[in-house]
Amino acid sequence: LSILFMQQGKHVLCEKPLASNAKEAREMIRVARQNGVTLMEAMKSTLTPNFRQLRRHLAEAGCLRRYFASYCQYSSRYDKLKAGIVLNAFNPELSNGAMMDLGVYTVYPLVVLFGRPKRISATGLKLSTGVDGQGAVNFEYENLNATVLYSKIADSFLPAEIQGEK
C-alpha cells in the first residue's frame, strides 16, 4: 500500500519494519524519490527525549563493552495458533514473526548507537507456520558484544542494559 500511496503523490509514514526485506525497501525508496514524497518508518523509540539523553550520557560509562536488550511478550494470539487457527500475528506471508514484530525494538537502538556489527550469529524457534516464535541474536563489534532476546511465545521482564568500564 505504501507504494500505491506514494505513486499518488502522498507522503507515507510506514509501520515498522519498513519492509520485509532489502529488495522491498529499495523499491519503496525508489518510488518515494521518483514521486518526490517522503517515506518514513514509524520506528520512533530512537527519536524520543529519553533516547537522546541516553546518547548524551553514554560516554560517562567509559569504554562500552556490553549491550543487552530483551523484548519478550506472550502474544494474546498464540493460544489460537496452538489450537490450529492462524491469525495475522503468525502468518509468514505478512512477515509477522517475533523478530519483525518485537525483536526490531531491541535491534534498532543497538544499530543507532553502535552502527553495523562485524559479525552476527542467531538462533531461534520456528513455529508451525514457519515464523519465528522467539530468538536470540549476538552482535560482535570491535570492543563491544551485544545480545538481544525476543519472543512472542513467552514473557520476560529482563531490563535492557549497556555496560561500560566505569
Model-derived features: where do they sit?
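Alpha/beta-hydrolase-fold catalytic nucleophile elbow
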Residues: 15, 70, 163
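Beta-strand-loop-alpha-helix segment that lines the small-molecule cofactor/substrate pocket
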Residues: 1-43
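Structured beta->alpha junctions
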Residues: 17, 43-46, 126, 152-154
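Contiguous beta-strand/loop segments that form the cofactor/metal-binding neighborhood of enzyme cores
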Residues: 107-166
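Predominantly a Rossmann-like dinucleotide-binding segment in NAD(P)-dependent oxidoreductases
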Residues: 45-120
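Structured helix-beta-strand junction loops
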Residues: 8, 34-35, 60-64, 116, ...
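A short beta-to-alpha transition loop/helix N-cap that caps and shapes the active-site region
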Residues: 21, 74-79, 156-158
